[in-house]
């Protein structure tokens, strides 16, 4: 077949006539999408990447426009085994909880209105009470992520002055969040002390001057340094700060509201235990080990929390009613004896290998023998990580479905799963494709079985 030329391209009007009855979108928006796709295809034609007849080209364009005009944020099956997957929105939500929140958020809500007094309220009040009770703090504040929490606190307390941090705690997490960069953007000056592997109390003491505004203690939650190491206990830093009248702040990263050891997970010190050291402020994430929406949680002394809330940056970083509602629902789940069932992240992280094996067998039982043979499907033991830099040393037991297809490339199989009517994202290792069951929701097992059958 001869190569497609630019003359073979249909007009916007022609494509519009073909699809206007299939898509209930405004013509102006459809024209925008059609033009966007036509521009892409012009480039592909010039590169000689398309060989289609005019009619085939029209069908091809219509298919692309239909895909582009469909909702882009869709429900997927997470077959990576990573429960707190950043690319998939970190902590997953319980459908029942979402429905409850949706009902409460319909129409108007008392976000900043006190129903008892009939006067203006504070959107932070309810969250503040929940967090203070769970964390043992005087007060609390919520902003849109932990990076925002750290930046707001440093800007308010240390703008124009120095922030003392151990060199061993100058962390970087995904998305290029670096402590030195956050300090700089907050308007403060980094004063790093000690070395990468060893920092002593005297290093902090020698660095204190009349320029010092804050001592920052950062939890290296996404990596561990072993061997010839030393770090200063938080209690010593708090005492040092108190002696010199310098506030001490903790960036606790992932954060956990309970003892992970009790759930047979790695030892992650609960936030409440850290607060027993009496730091002035502590920040952590709401969408990692806590299992809530994207948010940055700030707890600590009432004096400092109130000061942060009066900073103009708070207005820029504050959360909306949807985040507040979801976070409240998440925190409320910790008051229940069945919190591991209500909190989807904790539920999946603690699901035993035995249960996952049973789910995997159900999926295999659904498949025809020929399908299992053609795709080379086996149920195998696996190990996964929590994700998002949480519990970095903990390898969590799991089960996975492995695929070694006879007549299909691994990349084709992976693409077929991703782009199917039920999107499934797994991972490839060597010449094998895997769908790990750790992060597959219980209600998705039948859908996953159908997705395998359809691939």
Please name every model-derived segment.
Residues 68-79, 108-118, 139-140:
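Short, flexible active-site-proximal loops enriched in glycine and acidic residues
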Residues 358-441:
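Conserved C-terminal alpha-helix-loop-beta "cap" of PLP-dependent enzymes
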